[in-house]
Amino acid sequence: PVFSTKEETYELIVGKAKHIHSLSKEVIIPLEETVQPFRKINLVVRAFDDGIAFRYEFPKQKGWDSYIMYDEGTSFNLQGNPSVTTLFLPNYQSSHEGKYTVTDYADMDNKRLMDMPALFSFPNHVYMAITEAAVRDYAGMYLWKENGALLGKLSPKLGQERIKVEASLPHQSPWRVLMISDQIGSLIASNILTNLNEPCKIEDTSWIKPGKTTFTWWNGNVVPDTTFLGGNNFPTNKYYIDFVARNGLDYHSIYGNAEQAWYDEDGAGFGSPGPKADILKVVPSLNMQEICDYAKSQGVRIHLWTNWKPLYAKIDEAFAQFEKWGIAGMMIDFMDRDDQEMIRIQEEFLAKAAKHHLFVQFHGACKPSGLNRTYPNEFTREGTLNYEHCKWDKDTDADHDIHMPFTRLLAGATDYHLGGFRSLPRDKFKNQERNPYV
């Protein structure tokens, strides 16, 4: 084994703290097959004050160039009977928008997918969360209770269930992370996930500016006290741009109107773009350059919503056009997967967006894994049940809000719509598409 100490300081643009000091002890344990072809892998373990992480490295070596992984084989054998706070999922393709379950480990259902981070509260004030860091060119992992242990389950490649990862050497798995503390609040403050990611790849980050934005989809593009109809038009966007400027906000977000995106598409709505959807064709009622020019004159930056499919189909042309218009960033939606291909696509979005000075907000996406250190143009990820659901169901409540900081938010910045200005008691609550209640 090879032992070493890792110490570094770095800054985050989006994260739990601006200035981070990371200190850990590392051991690399080389492993080799005892029979031909004598393949070698390394088990790498790091210990921090606030947790432990391990990963598998597949070094470049003679006679072994690539691999196909059917199962990773990682398992966690917990002692005792902790209380578990987790989100059960029906399958690997998910928006991760569900309610958390609190149960004793002994009573927890077997053979059900558990989302990460999952929280384990032991007696005597010992708290542990299991998640992963630096998920890159790999499949996302879930937990699965079976035979008294928690098994790591990888998201399979599309169209089949057996193959999880295909890679050429050298390669490495994400870090499998156990966040540990005797104070539950310390889990929230932990920066272990960003500590385990590579340094920033963007040389000049001066253009990356998180801020507050309008959310016109939420209220249905209403334009109070006006004489025009709200929708996919310049007056509606001007109305909100003026509101942003007047109230000292930063961004105006453009989504579309009534399930019609701001770009040309022939599908059934925002989540189902048709085969002719074209991210480069703005609907005739909008002039994107005019909107961006007006916003710039008012000191307001523009943020676009888009479904990931038409955007990825023309990623290079679209990002170049966005930069030409003066767009600051995007909400990329309905990804709903974390198989190896989608993990690669997400990183490609971040890397190419950075070249065109665009920030990214992943919506309908898997959990963060600290990649906002490497690509600080990643602002937030959704993947949570939040108050946008008040438009169509009654699932959100105070208990869910309290679970969030100790589960999903442990992984990083979260796109969590929390509340609204029109509230009703639960016994009088009603779902409403425009001007919704909470």
Model-flagged regions — what are they?
Residues K25-V27, I52, E72-T74, S173-W175, ...:
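Structural beta-strand/beta-sheet cores of well-ordered domains, especially the beta-sheet scaffolds
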Residues N42, I163-E166, Y239-I241, I291, ...:
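Generic recognition of flexible, low-complexity loop/linker segments
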Residues G73, P117-L119, I241, C292, ...:
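Short amphipathic alpha-helical segments and helix-helix/interface helices
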Residues V165-N247, Y251, Y255:
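An acidic-aromatic substrate-binding cleft motif
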